[in-house]
């Protein structure tokens, strides 16, 4: 028996969770979603791209809303099939993000006269390396499908609209020294010791908080790794500390890199950028986004982590995270979602899409 998109979204969540779909193994769930949309949502144009399923209405509405969700999960940890205990549904992917997927699919099938045109994007391979992300493939191959006035990504957000996202860079800060026997340490130059001023500056760093569209983004500059040392009797001639800067979306990557260089200016070290991803502005002043905030009763907060909303922002589409799951429960063995939150998310989005 296939998916029943008109069923209660709680039941639909369970049905999706019970289809294993670890990254790179999404064909079965994509087949089920495609078949259900073709049979139960005749007002949508439906296409397939790899193991992603895309659907859209063409009703000539003045605005378009994109509902996007990944259909893959992290590896299963003996946490299938789904089960409901004390008002919570347990199972791999419940929170991240099959509950959100179920809400989107249910609304697509049951709203035949939306006030906005709707584009639905159910994509693969979000939980693994960025180069495999199905959304990136869709952008390359089906760019015209990624057009909207606002995009809603169903990532777990605790029922809040989490607007935009912070950017992230990683920088390796390296120090050079001179190797020597530790019994004659004065003959060497200890590279690890040269990192002490780096750690001092990190410890005393005052992170910036920025209010954008009523969302407060709090930056952070943190050491996340230290490498160094040769042997217990050798003064090391090389050492490094990896620093992660999470920056508010009013900075671009170049500005973030420049800021990190400023923080460590004057020290006897070198800096190498090893990873970078731009953030996304919330864009809540756009009419379609403002209406979404109103429908949510103003329950809005900043998104601190990086998500695929940044991909939409790079395309000029205001984007938010909104899903019934709890981000603190994603990827856990006891991953779960409150069933009442699924109903609440479906009700809120139905109001937004029909009024």
Curated annotation (Swiss-Prot):
Documented EC number(s): 3.5.1.18
Coiled-coil residue windows: none
Cofactor field: Zn(2+); Co(2+)
Cofactor detail note: Binds 2 Zn(2+) or Co(2+) ions per subunit.
Highest taxon in the source lineage: Bacteria
Keywords: Amino-acid biosynthesis, Cobalt, Diaminopimelate biosynthesis, Hydrolase, Lysine biosynthesis, Metal-binding, Zinc
Residues annotated to bind Zn(2+) 2: 96, 127, 331
PROSITE patterns, A to Z: ARGE_DAPE_CPG2_1
Pathway: Amino-acid biosynthesis; L-lysine biosynthesis via DAP pathway; LL-2,6-diaminopimelate from (S)-tetrahydrodipicolinate (succinylase route): step 3/3
Reactions catalysed, as given in the entry: N-succinyl-(2S,6S)-2,6-diaminopimelate + H2O = (2S,6S)-2,6-diaminopimelate + succinate
Residue positions binding Zn(2+) 1: 70, 96, 155
Knockout mutant characteristics: Cells lacking this gene show multiple auxotrophy (Met, Thr, Lys and DAP).
GO MF terms held by the record: acetylornithine deacetylase activity; metal ion binding; succinyl-diaminopimelate desuccinylase activity
Gene3D superfamilies hit by this protein: 3.30.70.360, Zn peptidases
GO biological process terms on file: diaminopimelate biosynthetic process; L-arginine biosynthetic process; lysine biosynthetic process via diaminopimelate
Catalytic-site annotation from UniProt: 72, 126 (proton acceptor)
Family: Belongs to the peptidase M20A family. DapE subfamily.
Subunit structure comment from the entry: Homodimer.
Function of the protein: Catalyzes the hydrolysis of N-succinyl-L,L-diaminopimelic acid (SDAP), forming succinate and LL-2,6-diaminoheptanedioate (DAP), an intermediate involved in the bacterial biosynthesis of lysine and meso-diaminopimelic acid, an essential component of bacterial cell walls.
Protein name: Succinyl-diaminopimelate desuccinylase
Annotated organism of origin: Mycolicibacterium smegmatis (strain ATCC 700084 / mc(2)155) (Mycobacterium smegmatis)
